[in-house]
Amino acid sequence: MELENIVANTVLLKAREGGGGNRKGKSKKWRQMLQFPHISQCEELRLSLERDYHSLCERQPIGRLLFREFCATRPELSRCVAFLDGVAEYEVTPDDKRKACGRQLTQNFLSHTGPDLIPEVPRQLVTNCTQRLEQGPCKDLFQELTRLTHEYLSVAPFADYLDSIYFNRFLQWKWLERQPVTKNTFRQYRVLGKGGFGEVCACQVRATGKMYACKKLEKKRIKKRKGEAMALNEKQILEKVNSRFVVSLAYAYETKDALCLVLTLMNGGDLKFHIYHMGQAGFPEARAVFYAAEICCGLEDLHRERIVYRDLKPENILLDDHGHIRISDLGLAVHVPEGQTIKGRVGTVGYMAPEVVKNERYTFSPDWWALGCLLYEMIAGQSPFQQRKKKIKREEVERLVKEVPEEYSERFSPQARSLCSQLLCKDPAERLGCRGGSAREVKEHPLFKKLNFKRLGAGMLEPPFKPDPQAIYCKDVLDIEQFSTVKGVELEPTDQDFYQKFATGSVPIPWQNEMVETECFQELNVFGLDGSVPPDLDWKGQPPAPPKKGLLQRLFSRQDCCGNCSDSEEELPTRL
């Protein structure tokens, strides 16, 4: 049986490496799968798409790139884009070099004698910026100028963009994005672990070669446990959050037996594995601080959307190929309505805050408590309120959480102890992160003094540990316990309403990022070299008629469209 595990791991590693060919894991038919429709097929989409500058030109990756291509055709707009890029670079520039970077920005884009003066900038605002720059180059120095530049771009230039071939090309990409997603969109690989309602396995998009984790929720298991609301809640929260520190939902689809969430694949294992199974338990302080800072950013992104996580623990923090973390498993996360509090005694014993244990009302305070527990565990090599592999009754753990201060060893520096103790304050009103400043309070703690959070948020800081690319950081295939068959439950037509709410296909921002990262956008986004309109973007032209199929083709052909095309036999991976 060891052979079975070796084969499964070998096939997965080969897929992660791009299959060893020039296509980097893409199907032989990838261009056919991502073939643009004729623009006339996008008319309904054109009429229904909301004309929002922020969404179309800033948030959506392909929309952002196409708007920039449009701006590159007009010098005054090209200067605006260059200024915005310069500001973004200024904000992540190290402190000791930021003033010089700011001076260069001012000279190029804000001075009348500069080569790239941007339009419609109040001179008084420029004067104020210049003075503030010399006094001290704060990161938000150009914030108002950035807002005014976007305001300028969002009026006449945006209107012109909507009438351009670049926006028409965006409609074609949106048409592809909205095509049905089925199990044939993916290749399936080995099981990685178990979720609450089914297995988690590795998978690969046939059209792009992008690897993901597929979390399968068995329909009968959901129905037996009455888990419909919980499953839909997790899906909708994942769909809403766009953060480099939280796993992304890229697709949601259904098969005959399961609902499937296609999520960011994290190849580096979870923090529980790294804390306890990679030598001495715990991390050096610098490594623990780095992970705590990234988790803080993830919590900040969740809380910005008014989502409280409620299940922060080592096994829910995953490492990617480069050693950065993402928060995973949002099954217990919930939206907190503006101006309201919630109640719910949920979470994991030893990580639940005192107010949760007491069943009191709260907003986001349990997450900051759990961050304190996790930081403590990363440094100490054990949880603050229970020792590993030592059985303590739940009631005793909860008594310790509510009443007994945690103990600190010599492994904690004074600053690390200070941050942990402020996060583990029993009174949520006095806890760091809950005094009115949220994540900002935590980020300003002296333990993070050497960290540039702007650079961290942009993924520009080198992690202290990089996972081995040839390692599989999960249990052997046969060591992952299989689910038993669900008996006594039958699926009914009325269940279909829930399935339709769940299986909504591609999620726009992750899907567009996938197209860009896998270079599909770069290879397919081609316009006429002489400035002419390509046939597929000509509103006056007619879409080409599909080639006629012979009788045998009509009888035996399978439906081929947008990622649902099946590969030839030789391309299919070994399935175990």
From Swiss-Prot:
Transmembrane keyword on record: no
Protein's membrane topology: Lipid-anchor
Protein kinase domain segment(s)? 186-448
EC annotation from Swiss-Prot or TrEMBL: 2.7.11.16
Q: Which modifications occur after translation, per UniProt?
A: It is uncertain whether palmitoylation is on Cys-561 and/or Cys-562 and/or Cys-565.
Sites of Phosphoserine modification: S484, S566, S568
* Entry's family note: Belongs to the protein kinase superfamily. AGC Ser/Thr protein kinase family. GPRK subfamily.
Q: How does it assemble?
A: Interacts with GIT1.
What name does this protein carry? G protein-coupled receptor kinase 6
